[in-house]
């Protein structure tokens, strides 16, 4: 996927928080610490691994492809790639009102580690807290190789 196709998919998946631009994807992909995972043309995940810690930067699954396990596969692959890159822990931020994503992350073993008050804005312009979730990583072999 190119930065343009990544931005187009992201725009189909997000209204709030705002979707990322082609330029933002291009900048991130130029960073050697950032890695991209895709599921066909329906799913993407960007992660970054540095100093023993991996961050799930964004995940997007096309609306018509949801509830088919793509998000679960992307998160599993993120955990595997994070461990391969030397991370022993992972973290992410999720909007408190994004129940589907929170469920996905809880099933993947993430647990609350903090809160960023008013970090996001919803479609009405109201502040929404970001929940910081984290989990420890085990051997990469425990997460599958894809």
Where are these regions (language model features)?
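Conserved GNAT acetyl-CoA-binding A-motif
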Residues: 82-93, 104
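Short glycine/proline-centered loop/turn elements that form peptide/ligand docking sites
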Residues: 71, 75, 97-101, 118-124
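Conserved functional loop/turn residues at catalytic and ligand-binding sites
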Residues: 58-60, 65, 69, 86, ...
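Conserved catalytic-core motifs of GNAT/GCN5-like acyltransferases
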Residues: 93, 111-129
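Acetyl-CoA-dependent GNAT
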Residues: 3-68, 72-85, 135-146
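Conserved active-site tyrosine of GNAT-family acetyltransferases
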Residues: 105, 110, 133
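Conserved catalytic core of the tyrosine transesterase superfamily
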Residues: 95, 124, 129-136, 146
